[in-house]
């Protein structure tokens, strides 16, 4: 570093020190600045003190308001939690004096996976609160201790008393041999104590639906929050995702539904201003859904008219639910909790499948045998349509050599219309309809689908064993893997595997019967047809073994039927019969689909010629 550089740095340092000394604030400025910051701190302290005072005042006001509201039932604000049980031969209900609510529901005749009676909910699984109103605000029943009075084995009154002459009663009564429990709210001596202008009570109801069955995935798929519009149809929230809905219409009932069991809350005077929510629970949590509902219903604070409601804690059994409407003018239609398919298929299941199933079950047969017999009966019913479909395919097959000749005659793409017209003419000459097998197939489809929809909802199959399957209502884990396979799970269902194999065989025989030829598009179609059963293996592996068993034997019967029909059909004789029809003058007259198709083809040909002539003139 040279002398000039050192001198420059020293001068810069002197300038910086001098500037700092000259620019420093005076003592008066320092004092003024200190007073400024002190004033800010004082203001902040005052604001914090005011905020704390305001919050304390609000909290105190809230407590005073709640205390003023609760002062009507001051004696009920303190107590000790106690439980009361009522029961009949089907269900056991435990009531909690804290809130006067239903604490648990146990079904005596249905066992869980632990071989103990099914408990729909217990303790903190569920909650229920009623908001009544006086001049000071809301009275929440969850904050009060009720007194159990007038108790019998099947009924009890939970009483919330202001004094000996003024109280609100929750009256619970179990009907004999029934899963239905009457629930009545009645005010006595509450004139002037409750807001006379408020003729409603607000209700909050929630329940975490337990996983009762072995298969979380399938049970979760059939568990949803369902509700019925007054005098109208039934609706539900999504079963596959979190869902919420505000319902402006009046409702008859709200149901928290599992696959085979439901908790239903019914209001004779209807629910209104309803909001329903459903949230998914994680697999392995022991629960499948978290349901909640907020609604209002009629309440007479004078006590002249009671609030009539009901609870149903029981199975989703079609005839059990249907019987609840017996003698009622306005039907609840709780049997809609049992899903039986689309309207036509539901009608078939309602009037035919269920009655035949019950008749077969009445013989004391194994449920596997009942399903086998039911499937055979269905196959017998649809056999005429099956035979007609087969014969239509057989006729098409024996005429295929003649169709091949027409294909060779018109190899060019521009001759496709002529080729199609000649093919249809050939079919018409032999009295064969290319659509002849479609209508019979469509007619038998609803019948076959009816049983497919019925089996998963049939609680009768629950915990019924057959062969290696210990429960026909859930999957049969013939092989269990120590890991999870995407789209398949951690197990392999043997009935599902058998169903897949028989479907591949059925596809093979069907493709042979149709004899689709070697066209590229037909080859691709063949692969698609073979791929479908393999896809079903992944889709249906979690489905009930009873359903896969039905699908397996149904397809197996179809394969056997196809083989028998193929071996008993003399195709040479069939061709001879078709040749005889060709010589019949009556067959020369084209009718039906063939005639309409030929007319359309001629019309298209004429339009094509007209367009060509116009272009030539130009």
Swiss-Prot record:
Membrane topology note: Multi-pass membrane protein
Main location: membrane
Gene Ontology molecular function terms on file: membrane insertase activity
Key words of the record: Cell membrane, Chaperone, Membrane, Protein transport, Transmembrane, Transmembrane helix, Transport
HAMAP family: YidC_type1
Family, as annotated: Belongs to the OXA1/ALB3/YidC family. Type 1 subfamily.
Name the UniProt record assigns to this protein: Membrane protein insertase YidC
